[in-house]
Structure formats: structure tokens, C-alpha cells
């Protein structure tokens, strides 16, 4: 969207690629015979299957949900203009099938950029961008901070689906598991039913930008910028009655098909006025003064409708008035920010530089006592290469030392009204009066007039170096960042009448070293460039809310002062309980169950035996890229890696637990028995509440070849200025010890203190062929 037109001949560019993606990894699970044997063990002395050997390998449910998926992208652009007016137009079409069946993503986009010089003093311009996104979604994995949530996503359904059951009835309709084997398998779901659930989302976005530049007099310029970002979305969900088992259909008001229509609209308006003065005086002194005034207003509103109890699946979302039960809700929110910035940049002899910045930001989301925050910054640089003592060191082409110190603010962690007292109505607040349900209202948030900006103060020292006529470039940085007044929602005693409060609690430190090296190794007919980077970061919680040094974030993770984010605390695994000794209140302590270590040697297993077993922060992460060209051929590649991090594999924890009904991972074929005293996997009738141990805190370090590309550029021919064809492979190789779907998984998205894998949408390997043409 930033491509601008240029003065000169009109140019047309067409870029396109076509390819295919697939997930190559499958979770190894028990086949039908092995599963039948396990079921018989669990339900002994009442076996489910008379002869397990008759079932063979059974149904491969993972193959039934995955597919090879096509992908294509087309980009057409036109640029041109004259000395007064420049125009750039573009159109894009992107179509990606999901590697899980019934999922896809389509995008249509148009853009137009216009710049026009009215006179020597006035210039105007605009950028317009319109996009339509249509997608069919699938919930691949569980998203709750709960070790049992893995079963709720499609990947969990496919792994846990009994291979002895049938996917379809004889008439071709989906066969609910609860309707097979006399309802024995009602606790597990046919994954094809989840694929049949409609989850369609349509998003329309219009982004408009306009600017006016005025040259008031030499050196003094004014620029006004106006932005409007308008987004409308529609989400349609429908779960058909055709996938509901017969027993559940006996309660049609609840289970006979369900629908949801969710519409949303957001509007973000931004204005910035920028005044800049640049001057050079006495030849050696440069001065740049900038003042900025900005304001932004965000509005979001939604209308939601849910319905259930449909008589048939004919109309789905389009006739919710035919449902037995229907509910509606709506919401609207508004927030605003304004900013004031002043900056002075001074340079002397293109050798010494200093930059002073003062910024004030205000946000309506914060408490009435702290709407505004002050964020100053200073930076300086010394171009050592310009000093006379560097003249003998001719192999240096650049050498610069720089440093900075400054404060920034964050408001993204809170919503529009989290500093205010709010109320809830409907649902659990409703009550009965005169035999009529009345909508009730109750307070649900404690106000916090002191809710304020989260502030990060960082200092940085860096060195930029280039040698051998810029053939080798090195950039090194040391940084130390401390974040105070963290925006955080903490739990409070229920006796308060509330469950949580949002405030500024705690502080966090990040410090580390970054190193980037770029080299032009060969510069002749064969050209070879390479670059690499590595970052070492240390992360530590400095304080919490002042009343405690530790906060539990889940059943296996904590926030703790002095430790990094994403700390895992569990019991230590001690193999299999070979003697049946008690291990923990709430656990059976049966022979063949998991055993944990008595850390404090007090003769019992309790909370005092929980220990920190790792954290999600990597010791370092790195990347490497290279490119070669010879004659008309070109080659490039990129790999990345992470080392030293841990990830709680909740997916593996779930499917190494032989509860019965659901299938389990293939390792359980070597489970404990009196004739096979394994020390790795529990016996068949030990399913239930397994202890959370370090067994499932895995090393998720990895090295991944992200992409390699081989291309060829054809000679210029008539009206074709250039034509390049290429092939690319993405996510080609991953080296890791991690046993989950993907070592980069985090089921809680971008959260910085929850790290676990409940089975997220797996990374796909892809191969594409593309062309780039210029006319």
C-alpha cells in the first residue's frame, strides 16, 4: 500500500504464484486392534471387543481431516506520472485453501495512491485501500488455559477418535459416535461433525489517507495527515442438526441445530499535524526541529444473535426466526487518544549527533487521575570514521558509536472502560418476579481511578561498522529495558463481590545483546551475499503487586519474582509406580500409575514438592539468509532457529492419558503391565487424573529452513522489460526434539505469560511456482 507513482514512463507489473501446501506430520496413535485391546483392559472384566485382532488398522482419522491445499496469488500494479502528478494503482487476489478440509481464505484488494504538486509550496496526496476477506474457519486446537482443552479442537478430535468406529452411515451422512456401540462413545466426537460446522467470516476494510504539505518558507514545512480506517465484519456460525446424535435430539430446544450471527463495525479516525524546521548554519551545524500534534478516536459496535432448536438444516443462518430459542445482544465502545511531541535533532560536521524528544500521550482508557503520560527520550551518535585518526585505517568504510535512553508507553493491554465501574445484565443476573423473567443488573467491575500508562524505560548502546568498502557490515547492540506499572488483571477474593481487578502491578526486565552481520562474499559474475543475526535475551519479573512474590497463572505455570515469564512449576516425574504406594491426595496411587518425587523427603507428596522445571524464554534465537546469482540465475535461502526454550505439551499430556473411549498416542502400546513392567507409560486402567510433571515440559528448540528460492530472469524482449520465473519451498525442513505438532506453537496466541500447546493449527510445507513481469 506504500508503493508510489514516479515521474516518467508508465510501468505495469504483474506478480503471480501458484502452489500447494500440506501438513507432513501426523501424531502416531494406536491402530484399531491396539485400541480395542486397550479398551478391553480399561473396562475389564467387561470387554468391549470380543476379538480385537479383527479390526486391523481401522480408520485413519487424521487423514480424513487433512488435505493437500492449493494456494495462488495475483498482484497487478500500474505506476506513472509527470513532474506534477504521480499515480500508482494496484489490484490483488489471494486464494488459499486450508490444509484442514473445509477451511480457506480469500482476499480481494484494490489500492490507489496519488501525489500532486500544486505549486512550489503546496503538495497534496491520497492513498486509498479497499479489501474484502472471506474465510471459512476451523478451530484446530483448544484455546483455554486447561490441560484438557486439547480434546475440544479438531486436531484433538482426530487424534482421539476411536479407529474402530465408522465416519459415515450407510446413507453417506455423518455418523455421530454416540449412536455407535449402544452409546458407549458419547464422550468423544466424530471430527467430521466439527468439519461440517459452518464458521464463515467476511471482512470489508476501507483505509483512506490524505495529506497536505505546505512549504511556509525555506526550511519550514507543515504536513497535515488524515486517516480513516473503516472495518465491517460478519461471522456466521451454524452447527447442523444432521451431526447431532439421536439421544441428544430428544431435547430439540437445545440440541437440534444451532446458529450464530455476529456483526461488527469499527471506525478509527486519526489526525496528525507536523511542523518541521530544518536548517544548516555556519556550514558545520545542522538543526532539525519537529513538533507533532495528533489525535485518534476509535469506535466499535457489534450486534449478535444466537439461535437453537431448528426443525431442519435447510435455511441455516438465514431463518433464525424458525428456531425454538433465540437470543440477541449488542455492544458499543469508544476510546480516544491524543499526542503531543517535540523533537530537536542537532548534528555537527556530520560527525556528532544528539536527538532530544519529549512526548505526552493521553488516553481515555485510563483512570481519571492518570489520563496522560510523559515519555522523554535522548539519543546520541558519534561517527568515528570521520575522525582524522581513522585515516590510516583505510579498511574501515564506516564506524559509528551510538546510544539512546528513553521511555515509551503502552495502552494496548486494556479495553476502553477498564478504569470504570461497569455493570452486567441478563443471563445470571436475571430473576423471576410474578412468574416472569426480569432482566437483572449487577456490578461487575471495580473502578480504578489510578489506572495509568504502562511505561518502559530502555537504554541502548550500539556499534555500526563496515569494512573492506562495505563488503562486511556488522551491527551490534546491547539493550536493557525495564517495564514498570504493568497493566494486569489479577484475581481477588470472592468475598469482595468481584472476581478480579485491573491495575498497574509489577515490573519486568528484558536485557540482551543483538548481533547482525552482512557480507558481500563474491562480487564478480558470480555474486554471493550472506547475512546472519543472533539475539541473546534475559527476561526477569522484578516485582508483582507488592503483596505477593508469586501468582499462579495455570495449573502448571506461575509468575514469580526473580524468574522469567513463562515459568513452569510441576512435580518431578519418577517413572511408573511399580508398588502401588500412595503418591498424592486425589490420585489413586495404583500400581502402573505415574510416580512423582518427594522433593523435601517428608514422606508425602503435596504442594511443597512442586518445583520450577523450566521456562518458555529462549536462551537465544537466530536467523541466517544467503543469496547467489550467476548470469540470469538466482538462488536464496533463509533459516531461523530458537534454542533453550521450553513448552508445556498439554496435547501430549491429554493423549497419553488412557481414560477410555478416546484413542491415545502410540507410545501407550508399550504401557505398563505385569508382564511388561514399563517405566514410561501408565497401564490401561490407570486413566484419570494424571499428575502434572516435568515429563510434559519439553524442549521446543528448533532449526527451521523457512524458505529456499531458485529463479531465472529472461532477457528483455520487445515490450517486456523483465520476466523472472521462480520456484520456492517453504518450511521445508524442521529439526527439533519437540513431540507436538509445531515447536512454534502457543495455544494462547500472543500472550507473554501463558505458554502451552493444546494443538494449534500446524505449520504447512509448501511449494510454489511464480512469475514476475514488468512491462
Positions of the model-derived regions?
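Conserved small-residue
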Residues: 11-56, 304, 417, 503, ...
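Extracellular/periplasmic, surface-exposed regions of secreted and cell-surface proteins
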Residues: 36, 43, 69-72, 107-109, ...
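Glycine-rich, aromatic-lined ligand/substrate-binding cores of catalytic
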Residues: 615-648
